[in-house]
């Protein structure tokens, strides 16, 4: 990812291979970055995206009532977006501001390597530099989840990278728990 970020000449969209996107997803994902200079990242709603999960917040979900992606997204598309600030973007499908990338730097390969936590660390560094990470509340993408790593390796990486994240950003869990308690998009 860092190799691509170094070559970027414009804003960037990171998308996992286990994600399906609807029509006009890129426009909606990137619009907040074009509209407001101090937005570092944008993340849509999805089935499995922790603080961006729908219908059950912070859970892995199946597609709502078995509906196809496009039908669910058609409902989200009608929402007047608020773009609430979040403590982190979520890397399954995340827009990144090129100016923020250049100011904050690249993903921390030394502490996170491949896997999990690198986007959370980057987003925390972006906040420290005066940026915001926002939820794109008028976009829904399907994240099949779990296809990136075998289960045993996933658990090991999650533990190691979570520990590294908390060493670098001791308030991360508190900030994320506060966001979850507030659940600013509950009405959706």
Task: Report each predicted region and the residues it spans.
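Active-site-adjacent helix/loop segment of glycosyltransferases
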Residues: 50, 56, 120, 124-188
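Glycine-rich, basic loop-to-helix element that forms the pyrophosphate-binding segment
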Residues: 1-8
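A recurrent flexible, glycine/aromatic-enriched loop bordering the glycosyltransferase active site
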Residues: 48, 62-99
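Short beta-strand segments
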Residues: 15-17, 40-46, 95, 135-137, ...
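Conserved donor NDP-sugar-binding/catalytic core segment of glycosyltransferases
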Residues: 19-61
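Short beta-strand-to-loop acidic/aromatic patch adjacent to the donor-nucleotide binding site
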Residues: 9-20
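A short, conserved alpha-helix in the catalytic core of glycosyltransferases
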Residues: 24-30, 85-105, 110-140
